[in-house]
């Protein structure tokens, strides 16, 4: 028993010479290094390049070209059928052309669409931030919970080891029976099993933490918080109003609808006129048998207005109209669902808070009862079973408290996520 007690004591993580890791530190680490977030940031950069590409269509194009041809006339006859003199030429032509599109409805609409797409990419990044940071908070709090359960079960195991040793001494003195010792040993076996489980859970949650957030050497360095590191909405109405403005799912659905509406306009622009002007300067050497060289300037204006594309345009408009109707319905559904989700998150937070307060009262009562029963047991007025049952209730209350504290904290962050505030800007991450 003594060897087991020493082993348990050595297994518990030490707090000495450790630098505390706060939730804010862990979230910053996740925000900077998470692969999925970095991928979404690249998506924003790609959307920015789409805007640059669209803007380039508004600028003039400059084309330089040159050609060289070699001619070999095999037969050349006059109108009367006689053979004409063959004078082969090898023309060489160079040109430079400056062209500017001055009217293109599709070009304007495409730029507007790409600007909306950039806003969509930013909203998708916010959504990914929420999911990633929520996972990080979950991993952080789960590791703290596993650590506390491990410590509680460790202390309980040490307590029951001493209990068995004391009961054996009292049995040898004739104060209790073998049945009492057997009860203590049975309780110890259960505590050993719970300790093994809590040790395994601690390892699993440590690995999960490292997978989501990053390397951690000692789980005891994690600093526990009772409340969220940022303020939460004060009332349910405040939460609902904030969610309408900030929930990324709503923002994404709105932007998807705007893009779909813009797609209709782009398709319709296929039947609208376009206009361009160009200026070309060309030089040709050895142009023909009668002309040695030519230097020419050409100013050209072009207007194009397609009137029919065989019905293809009509079907494209119909298709995009159907898609727009679909996205409008999806937006309406998300807006309705959002209010329900926020109300549910708020209700769960309030319930978690009430349950936590009840567990605190339960733990206080369990401590008083255990101390009283233990004292009475020492005086011989209580049985071993009374002590074991009282200790079991105390252990249950202790485990329930740490779980309730964690659940209440997560409920606060669940509300922030439902509202749309669990992002880098609101959390002030760098």
Task: Identify the meaning behind each predicted range.
Residues 21, 25, 131-245, 256, ...:
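Periplasmic alpha-helical coiled-coil/stalk elements that build and connect Gram-negative outer-membrane
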Residues 7-14:
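Bacterial N-terminal signal peptides
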Residues 18-67, 73, 216-258, 306-307, ...:
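Bacterial Sec-pathway N-terminal export signals of envelope proteins
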Residues 65-100, 223-233, 265, 278-316, ...:
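Small/polar, glycine/serine/threonine/aspartate-rich low-complexity segments that form flexible
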Residues 1-4:
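Positively charged n-region of N-terminal signal peptides that target proteins for export
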Residues 39-54, 128, 132-153, 162, ...:
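Amphipathic alpha-helical coiled-coil segments
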Residues 28-38, 45-60, 95-113, 119-130, ...:
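A glycine-/polar-enriched beta->alpha junction
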């Amino acid at each position: 028993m003594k060897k087991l007690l020493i082993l348990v004591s050595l297994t518990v993580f030490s707090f000495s010479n450790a630098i505390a890791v706060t939730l804010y530190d862990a979230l910053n680490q996740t925000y900077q290094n998470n692969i999925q977030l970095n991928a979404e940031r690249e998506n924003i950069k790609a959307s920015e390049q789409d805007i640059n590409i669209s803007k380039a269509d508004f600028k003039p194009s400059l084309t330089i070209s040159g050609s060289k041809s070699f001619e070999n006339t095999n037969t050349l006859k006059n109108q009367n059928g006689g053979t004409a003199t063959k004078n082969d030429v090898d023309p060489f032509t160079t040109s430079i052309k400056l062209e500017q599109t001055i009217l293109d409805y599709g070009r304007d609409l495409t730029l507007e669409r790409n600007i909306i797409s950039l806003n969509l990419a930013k909203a998708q990044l916010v959504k990914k931030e929420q999911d990633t940071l929520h996972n990080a908070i979950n991993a952080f709090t789960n590791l703290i919970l596993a650590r506390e359960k491990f410590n509680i079960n460790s202390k309980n195991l040490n307590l029951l080891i001493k209990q068995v040793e004391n009961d054996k001494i009292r049995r040898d003195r004739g104060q209790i029976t073998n049945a009492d010792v057997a009860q203590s040993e049975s309780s110890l076996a259960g505590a050993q099993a719970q300790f093994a489980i809590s040790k395994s859970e601690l390892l699993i949650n440590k690995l999960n933490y490292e997978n989501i957030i990053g390397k951690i050497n000692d789980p005891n360095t994690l600093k526990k918080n009772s409340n969220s590191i940022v303020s939460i909405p004060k009332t349910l109405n405040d939460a609902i109003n904030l969610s309408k403005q900030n929930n990324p799912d709503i923002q994404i659905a709105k932007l998807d609808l705007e893009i779909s509406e813009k797609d209709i306009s782009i398709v319709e622009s296929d039947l609208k006129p376009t206009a361009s002007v160009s200026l070309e300067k060309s030089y040709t050497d050895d142009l023909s048998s009668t002309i040695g060289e030519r230097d020419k300037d050409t100013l050209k204006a072009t207007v194009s207005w397609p009137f029919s594309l065989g019905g293809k345009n009509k079907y494209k408009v119909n298709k995009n109209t159907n898609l727009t109707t679909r996205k409008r319905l999806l937006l309406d559904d998300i807006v309705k669902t959002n209010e329900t989700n926020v109300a549910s998150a708020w209700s769960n937070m309030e319930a978690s808070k009430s349950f936590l307060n009840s567990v605190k009262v339960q733990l206080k009562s369990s401590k008083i009862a255990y101390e009283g029963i233990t004292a009475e047991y020492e005086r011989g007025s209580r049985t071993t079973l009374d002590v074991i049952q009282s200790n079991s209730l105390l252990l249950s209350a202790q485990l329930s408290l740490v779980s309730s504290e964690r659940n209440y904290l997560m409920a606060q962050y669940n509300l922030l996520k439902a509202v749309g505030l669990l992002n880098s800007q609101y959390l002030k991450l760098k």
